[in-house]
């Protein structure tokens, strides 16, 4: 099994290109189920979660290939609507095929999902919304079995809690439904916005894009002709490299990035004493690694993203003072705290609040527990005294494309080894 060995103390300099967003690419790949043509998706990140979803669609009968780093996928050959456990268990986002499969074929079976073990991330909101659209749903033998004999119909959906994948699932299902679907308390993350914009460009009228209230005028079951798609830049990967420069010190430039998607992250880094120069599609970050403490509350976009919470905990570990992090979106998302404490961090947990007192860190053997926790350990290792080995980095490979190679190019002393 691979692990990363990192020797701390190196400042970072240079430029790094940000990959396409994994969390944007996943629903776009699932959206291909709604199409009658070859769907071309550009800027696809080469990460494990993407490969898992492509494999899932291939198992359903879809045909896909890469042409010059563009994914070309055709789902007109799908001959099965059962997404089996052996694939779905690897990734929670596999549930994104539920809405498109049901909307197109009127029936499907999707295994209950796996992926990061971050507390309770129920799919009840997806299922209750589909039931309002006329679906009959039962859970049997670990599968969601969904039927809509006469097709899905428009409905008024009110999400009790904002859900990104739930919003994406229902928007895609509504695109082929009969009539109009309204979604209240919809997610408005950039990844959701891109899903809506692409459907809108393909002839499905959607109002309220970028707001908490969406209106989708369904196409009545007619398959879509999807235009060429370019995945938006990964705001979480970008945020992670911003944090890398902040904690290690130095001067790096992020290229192929969307600064407007990072306003809350940039604001908190500024509070910690990090300086920036913003371009149209670039961010230069300048840091002396002397960080001030920070107060963070995770919330939905455009607030501070939960997917950056672990990385900022790493920064707080070496800040000059006491920081607090209030995780309000997911339970049990402080699993990285105990591993950071192995490196000498002073983190105290009280429910969903972490209090972090800044200290000096020392290298240690640590274990990744989920995708973003693994990146926090890498960040801490960049500034720790001595050598750190980060184990179970298959979590990291789920969401970061060539992380160690990109960090090496910036001057970090990091290498991938096998146990």
Swiss-Prot record:
Pathway(s) the chain acts in: Cell wall biogenesis; peptidoglycan biosynthesis
Keyword annotations of the record: Cell cycle, Cell division, Cell shape, Cell wall biogenesis/degradation, Cytoplasm, Peptidoglycan synthesis, Pyruvate, Transferase
Compartments (UniProt record): Cytoplasm
SUPFAM superfamilies hit by this protein: EPT/RTPC-like
UniProt-listed Enzyme Commission number(s): 2.5.1.7
Cellular component aspect of the GO annotation: cytoplasm
Position of the signal peptide: none
Record family assignment: Belongs to the EPSP synthase family. MurA subfamily.
Catalytic activity: phosphoenolpyruvate + UDP-N-acetyl-alpha-D-glucosamine = UDP-N-acetyl-3-O-(1-carboxyvinyl)-alpha-D-glucosamine + phosphate
Active site, renumbered: 116 (proton donor)
PANTHER family xref list: UDP-N-ACETYLGLUCOSAMINE 1-CARBOXYVINYLTRANSFERASE
Protein name, as recorded: UDP-N-acetylglucosamine 1-carboxyvinyltransferase
Residue positions, PTM 2-(S-cysteinyl)pyruvic acid O-phosphothioketal: 116
UniProt-annotated binding residues for UDP-N-acetyl-alpha-D-glucosamine: 92, 121-125, 307, 329
Pfam families per UniProt: EPSP_synthase
GO terms, biological process: cell division; cell wall organization; peptidoglycan biosynthetic process; regulation of cell shape; UDP-N-acetylgalactosamine biosynthetic process
Gene that encodes the chain: murA
Source organism of the structure: Campylobacter fetus subsp. fetus (strain 82-40)
GO terms assigned for molecular function: UDP-N-acetylglucosamine 1-carboxyvinyltransferase activity
Residues binding phosphoenolpyruvate, per UniProt: 22-23
Function: Cell wall formation. Adds enolpyruvyl to UDP-N-acetylglucosamine.
